[in-house]
């Protein structure tokens, strides 16, 4: 049985994220080997990743796919992630995903985390 092409798997994963179907999104991630890395967090569990990303669901408007590059098992997407938040209404993101045997085993997201960090890190009071 042939596995789907890496680009198809990653596209389906992004479709599931955009549709806020996190249960379906989980089916595209490897059960035995998964790692996620971004400027604001990293994790090594697909279940933890889905639990975390599902919290973003309420503010996600759409994922604009600007350009896709494929090299073997690696899929690189240039994305604009649109949210309902004024300060983060369109975040340009580079996402690199590795697909093995039809499952995503690694995702690295690269973006300017300045506004995210302002929400996470408390500001010092003068």
Model-derived regions, located:
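C-terminal and inter-domain tail/linker signature
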Residues: 1-126
């Amino acid at each position: 049985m042939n596995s789907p092409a890496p680009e198809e798997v990653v596209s389906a994963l992004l479709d599931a994220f955009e549709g806020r179907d996190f249960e379906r999104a989980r089916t595209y991630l490897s059960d035995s080997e998964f790692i996620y890395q971004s400027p604001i967090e990293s994790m090594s569990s697909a279940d933890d990743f889905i639990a975390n990303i599902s919290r973003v669901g309420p503010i996600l408007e759409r994922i604009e796919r600007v350009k896709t590059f494929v090299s073997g098992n690696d899929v690189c997407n240039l994305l604009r992630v649109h949210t309902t938040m004024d300060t983060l209404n369109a975040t340009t993101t580079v996402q690199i995903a590795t697909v093995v045997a039809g499952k995503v085993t690694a995702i690295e997201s690269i973006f300017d985390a300045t506004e995210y960090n302002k929400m996470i890190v408390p500001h010092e009071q003068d």
